[in-house]
Amino acid sequence: MGRVRTKTVKRASKVLIERFYPKLTLDFETNKRLTSEIAVIQSKRLRNKIAGYTTHLMKRIQKGPVRGISFKLQEEERERKDQYVPEVSALDLSHTNGQLEIDADTADLVKSLGFKIPVQTVSISAQRGPRRFAKRN
């Protein structure tokens, strides 16, 4: 079974990542050396726990954003995604032969909002991918 990490370890790791993200790596040994250089930590055991949790969080950050941790690079990436504008608008009728192809629910929504857009209702069927596991007999 796993061990419970204390609030001290989690808070220290979070602060380390927010302040020194570019210097940290996915390697425990380098994070341990960096932790001992940056912070004054009372014991070797606590330093190792903080470095280990920092390494764990760095690996999670590589996969995607981690709740509770925000650093400059992550904020810039989020800002870029928020400001994204597509090359061609989905509502641009010049690329779709003068009509929008939408499902029945969306057509009702467009009609209730009072837009005068020529629409073509298309039936949408749920596409089911291949099963991940074989059926049992």
Curated annotation (Swiss-Prot):
This is Small ribosomal subunit protein eS17. Component of the ribosome, a large ribonucleoprotein complex responsible for the synthesis of proteins in the cell. The small ribosomal subunit (SSU) binds messenger RNAs (mRNAs) and translates the encoded message by selecting cognate aminoacyl-transfer RNA (tRNA) molecules. The large subunit (LSU) contains the ribosomal catalytic site termed the peptidyl transferase center (PTC), which catalyzes the formation of peptide bonds, thereby polymerizing the amino acids delivered by tRNAs into a polypeptide chain. Pfam families: Ribosomal_S17e. Its main location: cytoplasm. The keyword Cytoplasm applies. It is found in: Cytoplasm. Component of the small ribosomal subunit. Mature ribosomes consist of a small (40S) and a large (60S) subunit. The 40S subunit contains about 32 different proteins and 1 molecule of RNA (18S). The 60S subunit contains 45 different proteins and 3 molecules of RNA (25S, 5.8S and 5S). InterPro entries: Ribosomal_eS17, Ribosomal_eS17_CS, Ribosomal_eS17_sf. GO terms for biological process: translation.
